[in-house]
Amino acid sequence: MKDPRDVLKRPVITERSADLMTEKKYTFEVDVRANKTEVKDAVESIFGVKVDKVNIMNYKGKSKRVGRYTGMTSRRRKAIVKLTADSKEIEIFEA
């Protein structure tokens, strides 16, 4: 987990995450093996901002069925990153 681009997979754009952006909180889907320190370092190095706090949520895979075949969807890990008050905003979310 050395490369920051391996830690952050993609931003999560939902109505709830858009509301959190006003509080300088940004949501990313991250690698399932990444910890809070790796997420913080990745966001700081990629976007050039200062991170105050990182919250992480784990989602287990769901059981899905197609005909008589059953399978599982992939598990996911989501991180909500709060920036410091004096930090600049992340431009990727501005559209």
Swiss-Prot record:
The protein's UniProt keywords, in alphabetical order, are:
Ribonucleoprotein, Ribosomal protein, RNA-binding, rRNA-binding
Q: Name any Gene Ontology BP term.
A: translation
Recorded GO cellular component terms are: cytosolic large ribosomal subunit
Kindly give the SUPFAM superfamilies that the UniProt entry links to this protein. Ribosomal proteins S24e, L23 and L15e (SSF54189)
Q: Name one GO molecular function term.
A: rRNA binding
Q: Which domain of life is it from?
A: Bacteria
What Pfam family does this protein match (any one)?
Ribosomal_L23
Coiled-coil intervals, chain numbering = none
Chain ranges passing through the membrane: none
Between which residues do disulfide bridges form? none
Which PROSITE patterns is this protein grouped with? RIBOSOMAL_L23
Subunit structure comment from the entry: Part of the 50S ribosomal subunit. Contacts protein L29, and trigger factor when it is bound to the ribosome.
Protein's job: One of the early assembly proteins it binds 23S rRNA. One of the proteins that surrounds the polypeptide exit tunnel on the outside of the ribosome. Forms the main docking site for trigger factor binding to the ribosome.
- Give the family from UniProt: Belongs to the universal ribosomal protein uL23 family.
Q: What is the protein name given in its UniProt record?
A: Large ribosomal subunit protein uL23
Q: Which organism is it from?
A: Bacillus subtilis (strain 168)
Q: What is the lineage of its organism?
A: Bacteria, Bacillati, Bacillota, Bacilli, Bacillales
